[in-house]
Amino acid sequence: MEIIPPRLKEPLYRLYELRLRQGLAASKSDLPRHIAVLCDGNRRWARSAGYDDVSYGYRMGAAKIAEMLRWCHEAGIELATVYLLSTENLQRDPDELAALIEIITDVVEEICAPANHWSVRTVGDLGLIGEEPARRLRGAVESTPEVASFHVNVAVGYGGRREIVDAVRALLSKELANGATAEELVDAVTVEGISENLYTSGQPDPDLVIRTSGEQRLSGFLLWQSAYSEMWFTEAHWPAFRHVDFLRALRDYSARHRRYGR
């Protein structure tokens, strides 16, 4: 049974949204600089909505990504990292995967549109998604400015363990190129050295990690960088993620006392 009459839902939603905005405006200094988002639940949303073709869920989820990034920009967030395609996702049915990669390529090109004035960077191995999609993604990202008020990382062909391995390999390769001895190579493997060779090198670690669809795990997302991140989970599937959900995540983050493992 409906507790709230349908005609009142929209006004009450807008009122709640306004109150959340006002509360966040009063605590702007407590907002995260970097938000990382696992956009989970596209297929489940499609099935629960009665669609046999799960690619419809991906398309609706893609539209939500650009919308969510605008929320971040409007809120004053400096950097957002969005998990679009993991290395594990590459094992899906070939037809489903091809549709997903096409949708991801389209949404990244939308994110990179000049009208947004966002600086966009890919994190992951584009060599895993095929030559043509990789070419389109590189072209789109290279067209964005290096200096901007809002930066976006799109994680495509990304695996957290793979990133750490790649960082260590890059670190050791640089040391070898400089003629390092075996002992010097061992000494070179430090927290700072690995951090400097991650895909996100030069960027702050995420302050807040958001995951939709009720799953409460990282699934390999930014394993190194999220060691001290705050986590926020919601039952909503990604296509159904609302602005008030986003504002609630920011509100909850601003109320937390970060301990950084201490």
Curated annotation (Swiss-Prot):
Keywords: Cell shape, Cell wall biogenesis/degradation, Magnesium, Metal-binding, Peptidoglycan synthesis, Transferase. It is an enzyme of class 2 (transferase). It catalyses: isopentenyl diphosphate + (2E)-geranyl diphosphate = (2Z,6E)-farnesyl diphosphate + diphosphate. Pathway: Phospholipid metabolism; decaprenyl phosphate biosynthesis. The keyword Protein transport does not apply. One of its GO terms (biological process) is polyprenol biosynthetic process. Its EC number is 2.5.1.68. Substrate binds at residues 41-45, 86-88, 92, 211, 217-219. One of its GO terms (molecular function) is ditrans,polycis-polyprenyl diphosphate synthase [(2E,6E)-farnesyl diphosphate specific] activity. Its cofactor is Mg(2+). The keyword Flavoprotein does not apply. The active site is at residues 40, 89. GO terms for cellular component: plasma membrane. Mg(2+) binds at residues 40, 230. Generates Z-farnesyl diphosphate (Z-FPP) from isopentenyl pyrophosphate (IPP). Z-FPP is the precursor of decaprenyl diphosphate, which has a central role in the biosynthesis of the mycobacterial cell wall. Belongs to the UPP synthase family. Z-FPP synthase subfamily. This is Short-chain Z-isoprenyl diphosphate synthase. It comes from Mycobacterium bovis (strain ATCC BAA-935 / AF2122/97). The lineage of its organism: Bacteria, Bacillati, Actinomycetota, Actinomycetes, Mycobacteriales.
